[in-house]
Swiss-Prot record:
ATP binds at G113, S114, H115, G116, K117, T118, T119. SUPFAM superfamilies: MurCD N-terminal domain, MurD-like peptide ligases, catalytic domain, MurD-like peptide ligases, peptide-binding domain. It is an enzyme of class 6 (ligase). It comes from the Bacteria. One of its GO terms (molecular function) is UDP-N-acetylmuramate-L-alanine ligase activity. This is UDP-N-acetylmuramate--L-alanine ligase. The keyword tRNA-binding does not apply. GO terms for biological process: cell division; cell wall organization; peptidoglycan biosynthetic process; regulation of cell shape. Disulfide bonds: none annotated. One of its GO terms (cellular component) is cytoplasm.
């Protein structure tokens, strides 16, 4: 990895989920890390406590003295810090390129796919941690075992998410990769689904001749690209042509018990059939690395997922679950897992749409994603820096979901109004699911505190 001339690294948007993990690893390696973000957050506070100097707001002078400037895909090219760095001749690189630097002299394991990257990366990191390999792990959410979303290990392995959203995963140099699924997403960057498939083909073929590509054989879009993958392929899934096969799936107390090849049985610690596939991806990689099944089994049966991945925030008279799901496929999978785990209880889902472009391009899919909840509350769209699109908004989406489902669907507008709605409709034994990638997570904390104060008073 680079040394010598590069000592001071500045991050624009350092509080982002893809950025702060890299910053943590570099801090732990002794680099001087500075950064900027639009607002203070717990992530920013944690980085400050680790020794990073962080500015709130973007100002050209923030980059002074930096040897390299790292920016996220959310940073626009007219950002004043980015412009200043270019004016001064300071190298500016996307986060994917810095992540590639961390991987360059390690045995890289990269988890790719439209959904499930954080969970699968966390699973692989947990399994390898049980072996004594002591991997470096960089994920998109805070993992309880690490107390953060990154861990600097002393071993030869680095396990990381491979983010396809801006094509930056093509900068990585992994030895083993997993492709969990391919879905229509990030239409602002990719032209169409075929364009997305092409990117995953190119990503898979970056693996060296001695590496391997684990693929979900049950995903049709992945099946379509397999003939163009030129490297060793490990097929995982529940179909009979899988190399690593999960079978005899049984639902017990809302979680899945299943067998794997002739290795043995696993009772997964987290709910949802989609997590069976995430586990099979992690198992495929671990078996390829020679990890004994008994170690894999112990790790997955005691696995604690990253924050906002079906995170139970409160479990009293009402159960409150906070989840990052923001794509129709993720929403349906999370709602299905909720129904399996809490069968017979009333489910109330709150969804904050994320980005106008995503809501517009996947609108009909969103409309058809809320058949499971008894009550759905839709907030206004979280813009994530985008300009509004006239034809889509939260109120219209809520109305169209109501027409599609024939169930109670309410428009919450902002978080405060949504909170007021929830205070009036929540009853004892309800399950409240908070969904979205924006700031809706604040609502899970707010309503959890309200319920603690009201414990015993709900009817």
């Amino acid at each position: 990895m680079f040394r010598g001339k590069v000592r001071h690294i500045h991050f624009i948007g350092i509080g982002g989920s893809g950025m702060n993990g890299i910053a943590q690893v570099l801090l732990n390696q002794g680099f001087t890390v500075t950064g900027s973000d639009l607002k203070e957050s717990q992530t920013v506070i944690n980085l400050k406590n680790m020794g990073a100097k962080i500015y709130i707001g973007h100002d050209p002078k923030n980059v002074d003295g930096a040897d390299v400037v790292v920016y996220s895909s959310a940073v626009k090219q007219d950002n004043p810090e980015l412009l200043r760095a270019k004016q001064l001749g300071i190298p500016t690189i996307p986060r994917g390129e810095m992540l590639a630097e961390l991987m360059r002299f390690k045995y890289g394991i990269a988890i790719a796919g439209s959904h499930g990257k954080t969970t699968t990366t966390s699973m692989v990191g947990t399994i390898l941690g049980k072996t004594g390999y002591d991997p470096t792990v960089v994920i998109g959410g805070k993992l309880e075992a690490y107390g953060s979303n990154a861990k600097l290990g002393s071993g030869d392995f680095i396990v990381t998410e491979a983010d396809e959203s801006d094509g930056s995963f093509l900068k990585l140099t992994p030895t083993i990769v997993s492709i969990n699924n391919i879905d229509l997403e990030h239409i602002g960057f990719y032209k169409n689904l075929n364009d997305i498939k092409r990117a995953f083909i190119d990503f898979a073929n970056k693996v060296p001749f001695y590496g391997a590509v684990a693929v979900n054989i049950d995903d049709q879009n992945i099946k379509d690209i397999i003939p163009e993958i030129e490297k060793k392929i490990i097929r995982f899934g529940i179909s009979e042509d899988s190399d690593i096969r999960g079978y005899d799936l049984r639902l017990e107390n809302g979680r899945y018990r299943f067998k794997v090849n002739d290795f043995g049985e696993i009772y997964l610690s987290i709910p949802g059939k989609h997590n069976v596939y995430n586990a099979l991806a992690a198992i495929s990689i671990s078996v390829e690395l020679g990890v004994p099944f008994c170690v894999i089994k112990e790790a997955l049966e005691n696995f604690k997922n990253a924050n906002r991945r079906f995170e139970i925030k409160y479990d009293g008279s009402v159960t409150v679950i906070d989840d990052y799901a923001h794509h129709p496929t993720e929403i349906k999978a999370t709602l299905s897992a909720t129904r399996e785990m809490f069968d017979g209880r009333r489910i109330i889902a709150v969804f904050q749409p994320h980005r106008y472009s995503r809501t517009f391009s996947l609108y009909d899919h969103f409309v058809r994603s809320f058949n499971i909840p008894d009550i759905t509350v839709i907030t206004e769209i979280f813009p994530a820096g985008e300009s509004p699109i006239d034809s889509v908004n939260g109120e219209k989406l809520s109305s169209d979901i109501k027409k599609e489902t024939g169930k109670t669907v309410l428009y919450g507008e902002d978080l405060q109004k949504t909170f007021n709605i929830l205070k009036n409709i929540l009853k004892k034994d309800d399950v409240l699911l908070i969904l979205g990638a924006g700031n809706v997570t604040r609502l899970s904390d707010q309503i959890s505190q309200f319920l603690k104060n009201k414990e015993g008073a709900l009817r």
